[in-house]
Amino acid sequence: MTNIRKNHPLLKIINNSLIDLPTPPNISSLWNFGSLLGACLTIQIITGLFLAMHYTADTTTAFSSVTHICRDVNYGWTIRYLHANGASVFFLCLFIHVGRGLYYGSFTLLETWNVGIILLFSVMATAFMGYVLPWGQMSFWGATVITNLLSAIPYIGTDLVEWIWGGFSVSKATLTRFFALHFVLPFVILALVMIHLLFLHETGSNNPLGTSSNSDKIPFHPYYTTKDFLGLLLLILLLMVLTLFYPDLLGDPDNYSPANPLNTPPHIKPEWYFLFAYAILRSIPNKLGGVMALILSILILAIIPLLQPNKQQTMMFRPLSQFLFWILVADLLTLTWIGGQPVEDPFITIGQVASILYFLLMVLIMPTTCLIENKMLKW
């Protein structure tokens, strides 16, 4: 009698994806982040569902309903902070996952990489809309400033902004539609994740050496299920420490004041995971130019496969590229820091230099270095 998990129409899919999946034997802990992102998405959907049961998407009661969740609902504060800090942990895993893809040349798996970029945009859109829902000062002004950027689009900009707002300013209509979209988008993300995995399992995983591992593979279970479980425990530890000891560490104090259209906060800034893109936006004096740079800062990932002429897939044996990769990481950390600073010197200049360096590294310096390394290896 054959095993049911190998024959049953539904169990067969799970078996081929999580149990008998042939996996390279040498993938490091950096390959854990895919499963950790799945865990983060699950946590966000479950906590979000419970929050939605008590939240009201109305400008007069939204702030009060969040306060009610934290004060009166059983373990409401835990669910709320798990959801808020879960987003931070989600983005931390997301950035490491993308970084690993860049370092080890996973962008050569084109379909998987492109679906991943769509996923990144979807998660960023969902997180932005979620930040608006508590209807605090930073929620309101963040929504006003970021949606207003669309007015930079020639001809249709102003109409587009008013269409998104559902009126002439951020109002009840805006909040209601943001809540509806914030609720439905995670399920769209879930579908995209399935497509992402489908494409990945067509080609199989990359590995740190960048060589084909078809001749030497091991089953995913028990080897990598155990390894992923350890990563999951560490992720839950980090999330619990954040939630139970430092729940407001990554939040903004301004969001504890109800939204007031007549009073602008001194420094409008998004959550930490958007600060690098926000710094790039602010470093360009022209509005349309800033918006284009903001979008390109993420969209540039889509042209990475065209810009990498390297003959070796990974950076493991390419010290020059490794050095530039870590400069890129340092540059992004600098941009994140600058995004949270006020718009004054020397922060403006540092932001502009870091923004130029970011695009130069991606488009010019790293591809040129790849060519030099190819020459050095006589390829």
From Swiss-Prot:
It is a multi-pass membrane protein. The chain crosses the membrane at residues 33-53, 77-98, 113-133, 178-198, 226-246, 288-308, 320-340, 347-367. GO terms for cellular component: mitochondrial inner membrane; respiratory chain complex III. Heme b b562 binds at residues 83, 182. This is Cytochrome b. The cytochrome bc1 complex contains 11 subunits: 3 respiratory subunits (MT-CYB, CYC1 and UQCRFS1), 2 core proteins (UQCRC1 and UQCRC2) and 6 low-molecular weight proteins (UQCRH/QCR6, UQCRB/QCR7, UQCRQ/QCR8, UQCR10/QCR9, UQCR11/QCR10 and a cleavage product of UQCRFS1). This cytochrome bc1 complex then forms a dimer. The keyword Transport applies. Its cofactor is heme b. Heme b b566 binds at residues 97, 196. The lineage of its organism: Eukaryota, Metazoa, Chordata, Craniata, Vertebrata. Keywords: Electron transport, Heme, Iron, Membrane, Metal-binding, Mitochondrion, Mitochondrion inner membrane, Respiratory chain, Transmembrane, Transmembrane helix, Transport, Ubiquinone. InterPro entries: Cyt_b/b6_C, Cyt_b/b6_C_sf, Cyt_b/b6_N, Cytb/b6-like_sf, Cytochrome_b, Cytochrome_b_C_euk/bac, Cytochrome_b_N_euk/bac, Di-haem_cyt_TM. Pfam families: Cytochrom_B_C, Cytochrome_B. Binds 2 heme b groups non-covalently. PANTHER family: CYTOCHROME B (PTHR19271:SF16). Component of the ubiquinol-cytochrome c reductase complex (complex III or cytochrome b-c1 complex) that is part of the mitochondrial respiratory chain. The b-c1 complex mediates electron transfer from ubiquinol to cytochrome c. Contributes to the generation of a proton gradient across the mitochondrial membrane that is then used for ATP synthesis. It is found in: Mitochondrion inner membrane. Heme 1 (or BL or b562) is low-potential and absorbs at about 562 nm, and heme 2 (or BH or b566) is high-potential and absorbs at about 566 nm. One of its GO terms (molecular function) is ubiquinol-cytochrome-c reductase activity. Belongs to the cytochrome b family. GO terms for biological process: mitochondrial electron transport, ubiquinol to cytochrome c. A ubiquinone binds at residue 201.
